[in-house]
């Protein structure tokens, strides 16, 4: 029997070593298990947690990798909610764009080709615009309302359009030079931002108010009164007249003198006459209205074109990107002619813009509805190839869209819509309009086929509804861009049209083409839905329909 000072069981040195080894083995095994949990299971749990944030992304793995980068750089944590991640992602995107600007400027300073310098100038302008749009979107997201969601979606759609436009302009550059601008990365980030936005907020489901006799609600009551007035009676802030009876002799001078970032409407009245100039309403010139003496009396004319060295973007006779832009009772034309190819008369990238009772004349690429929300009413647009193109969210009502006689071997395309991502809130809607032939086309209409449109980009979206289609429209209705490009991903629709060109029995059989029979589907392309008209155009006496005719 052991004494009180001795253990009941004595252990040898060898036994103690075995026990220590087992404990060490257990600790190592536990550490390895924890390692596997952290480095194998945790990423899986992270992916599960944030998969909803990236569920609408075209490349969900890329989207998740961007989120992972934010966490790795301690910009957000793995517990951050989707809204916080989106805002930080947008802040970092601004940083990326600001880094790209000096790179583009440096490339521009290293080349001598005028056309390429022009393209890079366009890119610099578009990058500056995009920085502002992303910053505005961050502020809108913070407000967490449905109307602000619609604003952010429109602005971020514009950012993606800006980047794609820049890339299109650089098509003649070497791949190495394009890679240096980081444009592919910016485009990817813009697409992911739209996908994140779609997952963290609820789209605006606007309530429609029946009736006619109103302008979309984003026109204020003061703007309504202005739009009811003639130019000479409007009480303009500035008057332009060629004969010296106004303060300015050119529209460009008057626009330059207008206040920057005005919170109230600033009106420029342009007296009758023909003004040969190119005019740009920059992003700083907000809430600007330009009004003339009528679409046949006040004419702004230019002739810049691609053949002579301009970029398509910069060829516009009048370009407007300042928010809240209104153009009324005026003609904008580009007289370059069909032999000069792309030659824009009017380019609009101004959010919540209104073009009312205007004439827009050119041939190829007449009206560049570039981006943001736009409304056209009682206007007259002429052209040949792709004469309404771009990636705005735009509605035309009570307009005449007039196909002209094109050049030899050419065909007329009324639209060429440029949506590049399904999360973009963009598309072209033609409602209560007449699509007809010009006097010079009528005698030879059978020699030059005219189509409602063709897909400029992969997710092109255009709807023609409740409109008159003249006999100039080819029975197939729509044309290919190149082979089967975009035929499965586009959305082209027709709803309740009339006229000799409105029959759909011989229309194209593409997967993306729709003869719309459900009014609820057509409603998505109305003023209230496509451009959220109920939230930014107040009631006016100018005829307007927010939904469909009964």
Swiss-Prot record:
UniProt-annotated catalytic positions: 365 (proton donor), 386 (nucleophile)
Glycosylation sites: 179
Family to which the UniProt record says this protein belongs: In the N-terminal section; belongs to the PMEI family. In the C-terminal section; belongs to the pectinesterase family.
Main location: secreted
UniProt keywords, alphabetically: Aspartyl esterase, Cell wall, Cell wall biogenesis/degradation, Disulfide bond, Fruit ripening, Glycoprotein, Hydrolase, Secreted, Signal, Zymogen
Protein name according to UniProt: Pectinesterase 2.1
Entry's Gene Ontology BP terms: cell wall modification; fruit ripening; pectin catabolic process
Gene Ontology cellular-component annotations: extracellular region
A Pfam match: Pectinesterase
Gene (name only): PME2.1
The protein's annotated pathway: Glycan metabolism; pectin degradation; 2-dehydro-3-deoxy-D-gluconate from pectin: step 1/5
Cross-referenced PROSITE patterns: PECTINESTERASE_1, PECTINESTERASE_2
